[in-house]
Amino acid sequence: GLCTEDNIAMTPYSALASGRLSRKEGYTRRATEDDYARGKYDSTAEQDRSIIERVAELAERHLVSMTEISLAWLLTKVTSPVVGATKKAHVDGAVNAVNLQLSPEEIQFLEETYQPHVLTGIMAQNTPQTKDVKQVWMR
């Protein structure tokens, strides 16, 4: 890609898709309370389901958390992800991911069902047309 070709460092935020790549599907308090995350990810829930299932499968195979698998994959693509942590276990998962090596076959397994999403969140809302609109992060 462009970043690799031009030696541009990339540091993505929301590395775990607001927690969706850190646990199997199901009820969470955040899922019911975080309107912003739902707005970003609910429309792609069906297409993302197979990836989440594959992350869970590899986590079981490696005997690690889904967080570790997700971040280990991301670390093969970027300089450093921005990882939010509200609990010690979140930090532990991020640290452990640094030492987890996924095989090329495992990386392919995670990527083969991916379908690109339309731009969403802050980047999609940060346009000249919406510069004066009150956004969720301005509350």
Task: Kindly give the residue locations of the regions a language model identified.
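Hydrophobic, secondary-structure "cap" segments at the distal end of domains
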Residues: 72-73
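Glycine/threonine-rich phosphate-binding loop and adjacent beta-strand/alpha-helix elements that clamp
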Residues: 69
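Glycine-rich phosphate-binding active-site loops on the catalytic face of alpha/beta enzymes
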Residues: 80-90
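Alpha-helix N-cap and coil->helix boundary residues
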Residues: 65-66, 86, 102-105
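A structural micro-motif
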Residues: 8, 79-80
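Short secondary-structure transition/capping segments
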Residues: 22-26, 81, 94-95
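Aromatic-lined glycan-binding groove of carbohydrate-active enzymes
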Residues: 1-33, 65
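Terminal-tail/helix-coil boundary detector
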Residues: 5, 29-57, 61, 76, ...
